[in-house]
C-alpha cells in the first residue's frame, strides 16, 4: 500500500494509526469530501449516494488491488467515455466512480479540508458528521489547504496558515514573498458568484434550513 498526499497539505500529527489501517478488503481509504451529500454528484457519476464520495487529496491506496484491476486502463477508458463534462473533479471523480463499492471511509481528522473550518460549509453535509468534524478541527492529523487561496497568498484566512510559516522557515526558501491570488473576475465569473449567493435566500425562505443554520452558528461558538 501507499499513502498519497496532495502537495497542499501539512502533516500535524502521527500517521501511524492511519498507516496501520487494514485495507486488504478495500481498494482505497479516504475522507468524505464536502460534496459527499450532493445528490447531483451521484447522478452524474452513476452510483448510489449511500456509498459516499471521498476527497482524493489524501488516500491510503491498496496497490495490489489497483494493479490487479489494471486501474490505469480503467481510468483511461472512463475518461474517454464520460469526458470532462461528467468527470468535473477529474481524478477524484474517476477514483470514486471506479471504486465506490470498495472505499473505506476514514475519520475527518486525516484530511481536514479547509471548507470544514468554516461552519457555513457544513450545510452541505449530514448533521451526523458534525461531532466528528468538530474533533477534526480541534485535533487535525492532516490539514488540507484545498481552497484557491493558499497560505502563501495574502487573501488566505485559514487559521492554520501559521503552521505553513513555521515549516517554511525550515526550508531553503524562508523569505519567499507572498503573492495575491485574487484576479480580475470575468463577467461570467461574476454571474456565477451572484448565482451562488441565491442559495442564502433559499435558506432564509425555508424554516428547516434556517434551523440548520442556527445549529451551525451555535457550533461555531463552540469551535471558535
Region locations from a protein language model:
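A recurrent flexible, glycine/aromatic-enriched loop bordering the glycosyltransferase active site
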Residues: 48-58
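Short glycine- and hydrophobic/aromatic-rich loop-to-beta-strand nucleating segment
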Residues: 57-66
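A glycosyltransferase accessory/donor-loop signature
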Residues: 66-224
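Short, P/G- and charge-enriched loop/turn segments at secondary-structure junctions
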Residues: 43-49, 127-132
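GT-A fold catalytic core of metal-dependent nucleotide-sugar glycosyltransferases
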Residues: 1-38, 60-61
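Small-molecule pocket liners
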Residues: 26-27, 56-57, 141
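A short, conserved beta-to-alpha structural element at the edge of catalytic cores
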Residues: 28-48, 157-160, 172-173
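Extracellular/periplasmic catalytic domains that process cell-envelope and extracellular macromolecules
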Residues: 22-23, 51-53, 134-137
